[in-house]
UniProtKB/Swiss-Prot annotation:
Pfam families, per the entry: RecX_HTH1, RecX_HTH2, RecX_HTH3
HAMAP family in the cross-refs: RecX (MF_01114)
Biological process, per Gene Ontology: regulation of DNA repair
Subcellular location: Cytoplasm
Keyword Glycoprotein: no
Family under the similarity heading: Belongs to the RecX family.
Xref: PANTHER family: REGULATORY PROTEIN RECX FAMILY PROTEIN
Name of the featured protein: Regulatory protein RecX
Keywords: Cytoplasm
Disulphide bridges: none
Function of the molecule: Modulates RecA activity.
GO cellular component terms given for this protein: cytoplasm
Length: 165
């Protein structure tokens, strides 16, 4: 007995895959390209195939037309999400660039976001080290290292102490 369903084209399988990927969360164009470039799954090893660049381009273009793929929207949402998790602008910018977002798109997304990075740095420091922030030099250095690791700029970190001394 043979399989009665006809084999779907690589393009339609790629389109389905893109929709499943984008249904989970927003992705940058580079992330989606990378994920679509992997081997298309099949029922068995003979049916697995590599997606062609032309099919990937068509799927990416279709996703842009349908507004499912938008790097600017992705950057805005990513900044908001990572900011809520306590990461600073420097680290978020680096992560966005690793995900294929251009420097100009990053700059415009950060300009549009309404996050007070200095206040957020203060909140993170107080959450980690307690409400009256440490005043001795070794403890201040510890706070600075923590906030630098989280991706805050040194100006924001210094402003925490400057504004409350």
């Amino acid at each position: 007995m043979t399989d009665a369903t006809p084999r779907r084209s690589a393009y339609s399988r790629l389109l389905d895959r893109a929709m499943r990927i984008l249904a989970m969360r927003d992705h940058s164009e580079q992330e989606l390209r990378r994920k679509l470039g992997a081997v298309l799954p099949g029922k068995n090893e003979e049916e697995q195939e590599q997606a062609t660049p032309e099919d990937i381009e068509k799927v990416i273009a279709w996703c842009h037309e349908q507004h499912y793929l938008d790097d600017a929207r992705f950057a805005e949402r990513y900044i908001a999400s990572r900011g809520r998790k306590g990461y600073g602008p420097q680290r978020i910018r680096q992560e966005l660039q690793q995900k294929g977002i251009s420097r100009n798109a990053c700059d415009s997304a950060f300009a549009d976001c309404e996050v007070d990075w200095e206040q957020q740095a203060r909140d993170q420091a107080e959450r980690k080290f307690g409400a009256p922030l440490p005043r001795t030099f070794p403890e201040k250095a510890k706070v600075q290292r923590f906030l630098l690791y989280r991706g805050y700029y040194m100006e924001d970190i210094q402003a925490i102490y400057r504004n409350f001394e």
